[in-house]
C-alpha cells in the first residue's frame, strides 16, 4: 500500500520504486521504472496500470489475474480486461524495457473495456454484457459487478497530459482561453427547444407521479424542454443524441433495479416496438432482458408471469404462425380495439407499494364529527376512552364543572335502555372492556343524580394502559334520605342509600347535607377520589382512608336507574334512644372484595335487585326480632354507621359518631 501511495503521488513521472503496488493486485509484468497510464481504485486497494492490458477477476488454481477482487461467486475468474489499442501516438518518454511489439504504455491512447464474465458489468450504470464489442472508456468511470456492491473507479492518467498538449497547440486557446476547443453547431431557430416561462406555482410531473416539492418535479433542461444558455456547452458532451435515447427507451433504467412496470406493460412495450407489431414468446423475453438488466440476473420466475399474462389477459391475442413462415411458436399481438389505450399506459410508472401519494390528515381512529359534549354524561367519547385523536386533541377544552352554579340549568342525564358489550378493534385501548350504550330521554323531576368515582382493583398483571371511565348513579330520592356518613368504612366497601359499593382505593369526603325545597329531606353527595399510593404509616392516624394496593388503574362505570315514586320507599321502624328517633341501615356487602362486583353489568344487576326493605331493630322487646345492626369493623377497630332521617323536623336528627 505504501508503494502504491508513492507511485500515486508521482504519477506521470518515473517513480522511485518499480512495484505496480496495491492490495488485491496480484499480477506482475509491470516493468520497473515504467509510466503509470491509469489507476484502478477499489474499497481496499489501489492499482497503477503500467502495461497495455490488465485483467480483473479472482485468483484460482487455473491462474492468477492482475487485479483480484476476492472470492465472490458473482465475479468470474477472468471478468474484465482493460487494454489500449496498438498504434497510439506518444508524447515523449521512451520505455526501452518493453518489447518492441507492444506500444508504449505512456502513449496516451484511448482505453477500452472487454467483458469476459458471464454476469456482465455496469460501467457508469450502463450494462455491458459478455461478448459485446469493446467499450471505449471515458477518462473517469466506475465499474460495478452485478448483484454486488463491489465497485472499481477507473482514472486515465495520460489523457490529461494529451488534452493539455492539444489545447496549447490550438489557435482558439490564445483568442478565448475560457472556451474549450470543441465545435458546437447551434441551429438558428431555438423555438422548438425553448418553452414559455413557468408559472409561479406550475408543476411538471409525469402522470400518476407524486411531486416531491411544491415547485414540482423535473428540473432537467432537456426533458422538460427548457434550455438555458449555460446548458449549451453541455450539449457537446452528450455522447448519446436525443433521438437515440428515445429509440432505445429513454425511461428504461440503466442499473439492475427492478423497473416500475407491470408484466402486462412490459409485454405491451415489447410488442409495440416490434416492426410488425407481433412477437413470439421468446422475442418478448429477449426484448425485456435487453432493455431491463434486472431480468438478466433475476430468478426465472418472471418468465412464468409473462406466460400467464399472455394467456389470461384478454388484451393479448395469439396468432398462429403460417405454414410459409419459418420457425416455431405462435405470435402474440395486442387487441386492436384497446391498442391505443394500452400503448398510452405502457410507460406509465407505478407508484411504490405502501407509499400513498396523498395522505389523509386524519387517522383511522379519528372522526369528522364533533365529540360528545362533556355535559352529556354516560356517552362514550374519545376523551373517556383513552384514545387520543387529532380531533379530540384539537377540540379539547376545559372540563365541565362537577357542581354547576345554582342558577345554571341542570343537564338531563341519559337513561340506559340497553347494555351490551362493544368489542373494539384488537390492539386498541378499548379492547375487552365493557361499554354501556346509552339513549337519552327525559327524566322526571323526582330523580336526582349522585355522582361518584369507583377505582376497581387490578385483576390481571398485564401491561395494558389504564382505561378511565366515569360512574354516574341516578337515584330516586325517597322520603328518607341519607343525612350523615361518619367513621371509616372497611377496605373495599362503603354504603350509599343502603347499597354497598366496592372501592379499593378511595378517600371519602365529608358529606354535604343540602336542604330541599320543603325542608324535610336531605341529600348527601359522596365524592370518592383515587389515591395512587398509601403507606401503612398513614393508616394509623387517618380516619377516612381506605387501604388498597399502591398502583390501581381507575375505571369508570355508568349506572343509571329510574324508579317511580314509592318503589324504593324504605319501611323504617323508629328506634328510641335517649329520646331521639334513629334508623340504622346495615351494609349489604361484607368480607373480601368480590371481583365480579367490579364488572359494570354485575354492579348494575346488583343495584337493580337490591330493592328489598331494610330491616331495623327496636330496643323494646314487644316487636318481632329483627337482624341486629351490623357495624363494619376495620383494622384499627373503627366502624361506620350510616343514619337515616325520618320525616321529622331537622332539629330531631342527630349524627351518630364513630363507634369504637
UniProtKB/Swiss-Prot annotation:
The lineage of its organism: Eukaryota, Metazoa, Chordata, Craniata, Vertebrata. Transcriptional regulator involved in different processes such as glucose metabolism, aerobic glycolysis and autophagy. Recognizes and binds the forkhead DNA sequence motif (5'-GTAAACA-3') and can both act as a transcription activator or repressor, depending on the context. Together with FOXK1, acts as a key regulator of metabolic reprogramming towards aerobic glycolysis, a process in which glucose is converted to lactate in the presence of oxygen. It comes from Homo sapiens (Human). This is Forkhead box protein K2. Mg(2+) binds at residues 310-311, 313, 316. Keywords: Acetylation, Activator, Cytoplasm, DNA-binding, Isopeptide bond, Magnesium, Metal-binding, Methylation, Nucleus, Phosphoprotein, Repressor, Transcription, Transcription regulation, Ubl conjugation, Ubl conjugation pathway. Residues 203-212, 382-392 have a biased composition (Polar residues). The gene is FOXK2. Residues 129-171 are annotated as: Required for interaction with DVL2 and SUDS3. The modification N-acetylalanine is found at residue 2. PANTHER family: CHECKPOINT SUPPRESSOR 1-LIKE, ISOFORM A-RELATED, FORKHEAD BOX PROTEIN K2.
Amino acid at each position: 500500500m505504501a508503494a502504491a501511495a508513492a507511485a500515486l503521488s508521482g504519477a506521470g513521472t518515473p517513480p522511485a520504486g518499480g512495484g505496480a503496488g496495491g492490495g488485491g493486485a496480484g499480477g506482475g509484468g509491470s516493468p520497473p521504472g515504467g509510466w503509470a497510464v491509469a489507476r484502478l481504485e477499489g474499497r481496499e486497494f489501489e492499482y497503477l496500470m503500467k502495461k497495455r492490458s490488465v485483467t480483473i477477476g479472482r485468483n484460482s488454481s487455473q491462474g492468477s489475474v492482475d487485479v483480484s477482487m476476492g472470492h465472490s461467486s458473482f465475479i468470474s475468474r477472468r471478468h474484465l480486461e482493460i487494454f489500449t489499442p496498438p498504434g497510439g501516438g506518444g508524447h515523449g518518454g521512451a520505455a526501452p524495457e518493453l518489447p518492441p511489439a507492444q506500444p508504449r504504455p505512456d502513449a496516451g491512447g484511448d482505453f477500452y473495456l472487454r467483458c469476459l464474465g458471464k454476469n456482465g458489468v455496469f460501467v457508469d450504470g450502463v450494462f455491458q454484457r459478455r461478448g459485446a464489442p469493446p467499450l471505449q472508456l471515458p477518462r473517469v468511470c466506475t465499474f460495478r459487478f452485478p448483484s454486488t456492491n463491489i465497485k472499481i473507479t477507473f482514472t486515465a492518467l495520460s489523457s490529461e497530459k494529451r488534452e493539455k498538449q492539444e489545447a496549447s497547440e490550438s489557435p482558439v486557446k490564445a483568442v478565448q482561453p475560457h472556451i474549450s476547443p470543441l465545435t458546437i453547431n447551434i441551429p438558428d431557430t431555438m423555438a422548438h427547444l425553448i418553452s414559455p416561462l413557468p408559472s409561479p406555482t406550475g408543476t411538471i410531473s409525469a402522470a400518476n407521479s407524486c411531486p416531491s416539492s411544491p415547485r414540482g418535479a423535473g428540473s432537467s433542461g432537456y426533458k422538460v424542454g427548457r434550455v438555458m444558455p449555460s446548458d449549451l456547452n453541455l450539449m457537446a458532451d452528450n455522447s448519446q443524441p436525443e433521438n437515440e435515447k428515445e429509440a432505445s427507451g429513454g425511461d428504461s433504467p440503466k442499473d439492475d433495479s427492478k423497473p416500475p412496470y407491470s408484466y402486462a406493460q412490459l409485454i405491451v412495450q415489447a410488442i409495440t416496438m416490434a416492426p410488425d407489431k407481433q412477437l413470439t414468446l421468446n422475442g418478448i423475453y429477449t426484448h425485456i432482458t435487453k432493455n431491463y438488466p434486472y431480468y438478466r440476473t433475476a430468478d426465472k420466475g418472471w418468465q412464468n408471469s409473462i406466460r400467464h399474462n399472455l394467456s389470461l389477459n384478454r388484451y393479448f391475442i395469439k396468432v398462429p404462425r403460417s405454414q410459409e413462415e419459418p420457425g416455431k411458436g405462435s405470435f402474440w399481438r395486442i387487441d386492436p380495439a384497446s391498442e391505443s389505450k394500452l400503448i398510452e399506459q405502457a410507460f406509465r410508472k407505478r407508484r411504490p407499494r405502501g407509499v400513498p401519494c396523498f395522505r389523509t390528515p386524519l387517522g383511522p381512529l379519528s372522526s369528522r364529527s364533533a365529540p360528545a359534549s362533556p355535559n352529556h354524561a354516560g356517552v362514550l367519547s374519545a376523551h373517556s376512552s383513552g384514545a387520543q385523536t387529532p380531533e379530540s386533541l384539537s377540540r379539547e377544552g376545559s372540563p365541565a364543572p362537577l357542581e354547576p352554579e345554582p342558577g345554571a340549568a341542570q343537564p338531563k342525564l341519559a337513561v340506559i335502555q340497553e347494555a351490551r358489550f362493544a368489542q373494539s378493534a384488537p390492539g386498541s385501548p378499548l379492547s375487552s372492556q365493557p361499554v354501556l350504550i346509552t339513549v337519552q330521554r327525559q327524566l322526571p323531576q323526582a330523580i336526582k343524580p349522585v355522582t361518584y368515582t369507583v377505582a376497581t382493583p387490578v385483576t390481571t398483571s398485564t401491561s395494558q394502559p389504564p382505561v378511565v371511565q366515569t360512574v354516574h348513579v341516578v337515584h330516586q330520592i325517597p322520603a328518607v334520605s341519607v343525612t350523615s356518613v361518619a367513621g371509616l368504612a372497611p377496605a373495599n366497601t362503603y354504603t350509599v342509600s343502603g347499597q354497598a359499593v366496592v372501592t379499593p382505593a378511595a378517600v371519602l369526603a365529608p358529606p354535604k347535607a343540602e336542604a330541599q325545597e320543603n325542608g324535610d329531606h336531605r341529600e348527601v353527595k359522596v365524592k370518592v377520589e383515587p389515591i395512587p399510593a398509601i403507606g401503612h404509616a398513614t393508616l394509623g392516624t387517618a380516619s377516612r382512608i381506605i387501604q388498597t394496593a399502591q398502583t390501581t388503574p381507575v375505571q369508570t362505570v355508568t349506572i343509571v336507574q329510574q324508579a317511580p315514586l314509592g318503589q324504593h320507599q324504605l319501611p323504617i321502624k323508629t328506634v328510641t334512644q335517649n329520646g331521639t328517633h334513629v334508623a340504622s341501615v346495615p351494609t349489604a356487602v361484607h368480607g373480601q372484595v368480590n371481583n365480579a362486583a367490579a364488572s359494570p353489568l354485575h354492579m348494575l344487576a346488583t343495584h337493580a335487585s337490591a330493592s328489598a326493605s331494610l330491616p331495623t331493630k327496636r330496643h323494646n322487646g314487644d316487636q318481632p326480632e329483627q337482624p341486629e345492626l351490623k357495624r363494619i369493623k376495620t383494622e384499627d377497630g373503627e366502624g361506620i354507621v350510616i343514619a337515616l332521617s325520618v320525616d321529622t323536623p331537622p332539629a330531631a336528627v342527630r349524627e351518630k359518631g364513630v363507634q369504637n
